Amino acid sequence: MKRYIVLWIFAMTFMSSFAQCGIENNAFKSGEFVGYDLYFNWKFVWMKVGTASMSTVQSSFKGQDAYRCSLITRGNSKLDNMFVMRDTLLSYTTMDLAPLYYRKGAREGKRYYVDELWYTYPKGNCHLKQHEINSRGEHYWKESEYKDCIYDMMSIYLRARNFDASKLKVGDKIPMPIADASNISNSWLKYNGVTNVKMKNSDNKYRCLVFSFIEREDGKNHELIRFYITDDKNHLPVRLDMFLSFGSAKAYLTGYKGLRNEMTSKVE
């Protein structure tokens, strides 16, 4: 009997360590697929330069139930003439969205690199294993442990879709430290309120919640991405504004299937 009690306590401790970095998911379900068109500002003209597709399915990771989320971006011939872009991002999270694994394989220009992250949660902490393969093919490894939760660009996307905006005020900031293979950024999400957004590739309009992803570097705040997500239970991103070091880009929703909730934010 004592053995079962010990095992039960261990199991509860193990699960609670995940729970502190997770969040209840009410926004999406397994089988959601979303598509986007990508646009780049070239000499003050917006050009369509590629596509992005995202899928989320229930899977498993090291024997436990997990969400598997992937994002694939592909530039077209117009962009290839200026800057080759082939990115594939993969993320595994627990069913309550605590991150477990992240990988980014990216060809950007003449540079190809890989970022990998593994997450474990010993004693309620967040243990992070980082692996980098740089453009020269060199491998770098690092391990560290934190009392606070650490995320990546995919797991933060899933987490942000489940925020309760009714409890937020314009200007509120939500700390969100983001890791890649070599660094952890001092970053946060800022809530900017509600607005209507028209798609560039159609006449569809959506009532959206607006968030900015901001990173502090060299003593300055830098807005890297502005998210427009539907003001309904799906919290589906319909537009992203990306502020890049070499210009600006936008992504607009083109289609979706497998949503968990009714799309009630569409403006007629």
Q: What is each PLM-predicted segment?
A:
Residues 4, 20-30, 119-127, 131-139:
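Solvent-exposed, charged interface segments at domain starts and junctions
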Residues 4-13:
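Sec-dependent N-terminal signal peptides
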Residues 21-121, 164-268:
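Acidic, serine/threonine-rich low-complexity disordered tracts
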Residues 124-180:
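Active-site/ligand-binding surface loops and adjacent short beta/alpha elements
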